[in-house]
Amino acid sequence: MLTLRSGRMGVLMYYNEMYDGTNVREAYASLFEWVAQMPAEIRQMKQAEAEALFRRIGITFAVYGEGGDPDRLIPFDMMPRVFTQGEWRRLERGIKQRARALNAFLRDVYGRGEIVRAGRIPARLVYQNEAYEKAVVGFVPPRGVYSHIIGIDLVRTGRDEFFVLEDNCRTPSGVSYMLENREI
């Protein structure tokens, strides 16, 4: 198996956000205390209730072509991710930078096309992509913002280490899942 850190074959490494190997991380301390007071059967019941509610009100995503139920529940954990103020500031800077870069890419693709002409990206990957909209060529939206909401999927692999799994400018459904998760 490929490890994230070494790039070599071996055991897949993961990062435990709540524990530092010995103790509960400071950012998770109050959440841990609250959850620790809740009996395991209550936590399991609440998880099952949340999943049933998700299914009943249709908070699912479609996976076509794999057989079985195409409407699957989103992966949901009752335990929220906790970020320190410093972590959140760093993530915010990086996410804003990605949003600017993605909008600059779209501005170029639908405008001057320099990235394709320079050979940085093959033309077929852009112009033959099903998401490419010919009607947008030459259009400049207000403030040059083509995508107002961008879904950026993050994974944490270390204490100060985050990686982007994907950017979604078309239908960032994860935003709606996140908002609904807060309600449930």
What are these regions (language model features)?
Residues 1-184:
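Preference for protein termini
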